[in-house]
């Protein structure tokens, strides 16, 4: 296919128009007084949101060269979202500012490669300053503050801090759409997996249709159980001890299942059987997790163990087990804390090493189940449009909170970036590298400038006042006052602020050094050609 090529200033201006089209759509959402953007959907109601990355993903421009610029900035927002989960609007605003200032200097004759080196050195210096001044986050109140700022709602902040308190910082917190109007937190304590009882005859509570076992033994195996003789020795020992039993196996069928049900109906002893969770190698790993959590052993031929030789000390224990039609929950397993801790460390190491997003997600689920349970935030709202918007805000706030726990917090409202700009004074560079540093210095003001503009203030006056105030003193756009941001609870995760700047500078520097754009020539006569081709079908009339 034929290509169209543009060079030099024409190429850079086309990219800049695309960058501006996307950035102007996103920047109006920044800050507590930012506006919403309505996104049209082919199916269903339009989506109303103030989430930068969601808006960026929807934008595609007709002009192929302008679209390249828009897609490059979209990459800034997407990468920041992937790394930190929030800060996508800040990253977009920073990228636009660096590109705008950079292109001015390139047009005036500066060397783009020199500017690029200056930008990289400046960003490194600012990131060091952000990391140095980040404060670790410990208290429940601090977690609530971070979540509240990100979501723009104090109630959501409290909900997320409650969830983190209950399931721990490594715990899984999921966000789901609720049926009703209220947004609430539901916590599943202990380990839960998606397998229910094999027969409804095993239930102990007919009202709730669930089986509850108190202080039971747990037999864990990766084998199929078909003959009762395989498990008879261990069953007899459990009956003698007067305890209940949970069997987790690949499957239980035929004579073995019938015998267990018969004993339950006669009241001889209570036993519930469930299938093992997961598939293949993941199933083996999950069975091992359950064994470590409950202090049992997986009966598997890989370890040279046979079902008929199982002894009672190979069985796991737990305070309580709840089994419904679809899931099993193990509460307070009796495993050794040291063993659980080393298993958690091993899974964390696997998470760091894996390159597959799917594997990482599954490993994080396993980690959460071992580390203390799962919290579900159920999002309620009056309309579906409101629910979707609220769900996006909660997901952003959750990601921001995790980032804050990881690397600490800095003053919010764009204040940390203006403070960090002072670190650039120590860089003694010359020529175009010095110009690169000046570009970053100006760009660091842009988020604060935009927050002030969205609140109806003159951005340059606000920036000047914040720069002359002490470190950490910023502009609270909500109360329209200048105050200590951290003391006022206006904080941003250091990881979000750092990632936004690094990703913005990376893409902006690449764009400044672009000299040529190549694109397909849009075909103008596709529709006409197709219709002309169909014209020949008129001759088919003679076939009748």
From Swiss-Prot:
It is found in: Cytoplasm. One of its GO terms (biological process) is protein refolding. The keyword Cytoplasm applies. InterPro entries: Chaperonin_Cpn60_CS (IPR018370), Cpn60/GroEL (IPR001844), Cpn60/GroEL/TCP-1 (IPR002423), GroEL-like_apical_dom_sf (IPR027409), GROEL-like_equatorial_sf (IPR027413), TCP-1-like_intermed_sf (IPR027410). This is Chaperonin GroEL. Pfam families: Cpn60_TCP1 (PF00118). Together with its co-chaperonin GroES, plays an essential role in assisting protein folding. The GroEL-GroES system forms a nano-cage that allows encapsulation of the non-native substrate proteins and provides a physical environment optimized to promote and accelerate protein folding. Forms a cylinder of 14 subunits composed of two heptameric rings stacked back-to-back. Interacts with the co-chaperonin GroES. Belongs to the chaperonin (HSP60) family. It catalyses: ATP + H2O + a folded polypeptide = ADP + phosphate + an unfolded polypeptide. The gene is groEL. GO terms for cellular component: cytoplasm. NCBIfam families: GroEL, PRK00013.1, PRK12849.1, PRK12850.1, PRK12851.1. ATP binds at residues 29-32, 86-90, 413, 476-478, 492. It comes from the Bacteria. Keywords: ATP-binding, Chaperone, Cytoplasm, Isomerase, Nucleotide-binding. GO terms for molecular function: ATP binding; ATP-dependent protein folding chaperone; isomerase activity; unfolded protein binding. Its EC number is 5.6.1.7.
């Amino acid at each position: 296919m034929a290509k169209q090529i543009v060079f030099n200033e024409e190429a850079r201006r086309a990219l800049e128009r695309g960058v501006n089209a996307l950035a102007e759509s996103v920047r109006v959402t920044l800050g507590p007084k930012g506006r919403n953007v309505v996104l049209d959907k082919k199916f269903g109601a339009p989506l109303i949101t103030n989430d930068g990355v969601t808006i960026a993903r929807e934008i595609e421009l007709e002009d192929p060269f302008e679209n390249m610029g828009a897609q490059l900035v979209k990459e800034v927002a997407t990468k920041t979202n992937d790394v930190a989960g929030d800060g996508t609007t800040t990253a977009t605003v920073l990228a636009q500012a660096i590109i705008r200032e950079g292109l001015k200097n390139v047009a005036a004759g500066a060397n783009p490669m020199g500017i690029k080196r200056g930008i990289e050195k400046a960003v490194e210096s600012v990131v060091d300053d952000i990391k140095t001044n980040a404060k670790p986050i410990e208290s429940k109140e601090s977690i609530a503050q971070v979540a509240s700022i990100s979501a723009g709602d104090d109630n959501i902040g409290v909900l997320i801090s409650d969830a983190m308190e209950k399931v721990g910082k490594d715990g899984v917190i999921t966000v789901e759409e609720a049926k009703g109007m209220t947004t609430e937190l539901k916590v599943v304590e202990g380990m839960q997996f998606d397998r229910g009882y094999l027969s409804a005859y095993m239930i102990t509570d007919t009202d709730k249709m669930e089986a509850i076992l108190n202080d039971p033994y747990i037999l864990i195996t990766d084998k199929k159980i078909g003959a009762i003789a395989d498990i008879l020795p261990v069953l007899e020992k459990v009956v003698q001890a007067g305890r209940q039993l949970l069997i987790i196996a690949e499957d239980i069928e035929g004579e073995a299942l019938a015998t267990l049900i018969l004993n339950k109906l006669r009241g001889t002893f209570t036993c519930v059987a469930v299938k093992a969770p997961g598939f293949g190698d993941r199933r083996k790993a999950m069975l091992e997790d359950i064994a470590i959590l409950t202090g049992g052993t997986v009966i598997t031929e890989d370890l040279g163990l046979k079902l008929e030789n199982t002894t009672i000390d190979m069985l796991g224990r737990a305070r309580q087990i709840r089994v419904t039609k679809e899931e099993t929950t193990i509460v307070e397993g009796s495993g050794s804390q040291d063993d659980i801790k080393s298993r958690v460390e091993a899974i964390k190491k696997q998470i760091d090493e894996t390159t597959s997003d799917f594997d990482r997600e599954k490993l994080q689920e396993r980690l959460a189940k071992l580390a203390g349970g799962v919290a579900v935030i159920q999002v309620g709202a009056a309309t579906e449009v409101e629910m979707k918007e609220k769900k996006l805000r909660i997901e952003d706030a959750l990601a921001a909170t995790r980032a804050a726990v990881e690397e600490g917090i800095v003053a919010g409202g764009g204040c940390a970036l203006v403070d960090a700009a002072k670190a650039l004074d120590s860089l003694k560079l010359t020529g175009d590298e010095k110009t690169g540093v000046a570009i970053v210095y100006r760009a660091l003001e842009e988020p604060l400038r935009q927050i002030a503009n969205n609140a109806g203030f003159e951005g340059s006056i606000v920036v000047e006042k914040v720069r002359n105030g002490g470190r950490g003193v910023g502009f609270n756009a909500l109360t329209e006052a200048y105050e200590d941001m951290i003391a006022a609870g206006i904080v941003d995760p250091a990881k979000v602020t750092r990632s936004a700047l690094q990703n913005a500078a990376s893409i902006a520097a690449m764009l400044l050094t672009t000299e040529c754009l190549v694109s397909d020539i849009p075909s103008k006569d596709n529709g006409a050609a197709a219709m002309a081709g169909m014209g020949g079908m008129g001759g088919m009339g003679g076939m009748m």
